[in-house]
Amino acid sequence: YIDEETMHLHHDKHHQTYVNNVNAALEKHPEIGEDLESLLADVESIPADIRQAVINNGGGHLNHALFWELMTPEQTAPSAELAAAIDATFGSFEDFKAAFTAAATTRFGSGWAWSVVNKEGKLEVTSTANQDTPLSEGKTPILGL
């Protein structure tokens, strides 16, 4: 359970700050012209003078945007395809939840727990520090907390 005050803090303060800061960094290099996901998937392509700001704030924006997109007041089940992949990878949905919980609760300091599709097209559970995004590791996030 996450309380309403925490949700407002993350949406109205944290997420908005990430958006403002990444936009300010990108304004310094309008020639980049790529979308944020593409930039974070290839961080070496980001000009050095704004690279860390884009990684930190762009990651914060994308991480939170996915989080908001996936939020629902209703409990939902994975699609049949995702459920089959979870069973094939983790053995059961309960084992997946245990792995995801471990990724979230063992992260030292701030960060995110993720369910991702890796470069081989397989599911995995991982975590990233601070506002780092799995996109920078060549992984596609499908669930983040």
From Swiss-Prot:
GO terms for molecular function: metal ion binding; superoxide dismutase activity. The keyword Iron applies. Mn(2+) binds at H10, H64. InterPro entries: Mn/Fe_SOD (IPR001189), Mn/Fe_SOD_C (IPR019832), Mn/Fe_SOD_N (IPR019831), Mn/Fe_SOD_N_sf (IPR036324), SOD_C_sf (IPR036314). Keywords: Iron, Manganese, Metal-binding, Oxidoreductase. GO terms for cellular component: cytoplasm. Destroys superoxide anion radicals which are normally produced within the cells and which are toxic to biological systems. Catalyzes the dismutation of superoxide anion radicals into O2 and H2O2 by successive reduction and oxidation of the transition metal ion at the active site. It catalyses: 2 superoxide + 2 H(+) = H2O2 + O2. SUPFAM superfamilies: Fe,Mn superoxide dismutase (SOD), C-terminal domain, Fe,Mn superoxide dismutase (SOD), N-terminal domain. It comes from Streptococcus parasanguinis. Fe(3+) binds at H10, H64. It is an enzyme of class 1 (oxidoreductase). Changing L135I: In strain: NEM895. Its EC number is 1.15.1.1. Belongs to the iron/manganese superoxide dismutase family. Binds 1 Mn(2+) or Fe(3+) ion per subunit. This is Superoxide dismutase [Mn/Fe]. Gene3D superfamilies: Fe,Mn superoxide dismutase (SOD) domain, Iron/manganese superoxide dismutase, C-terminal domain. Signal peptide: none annotated.
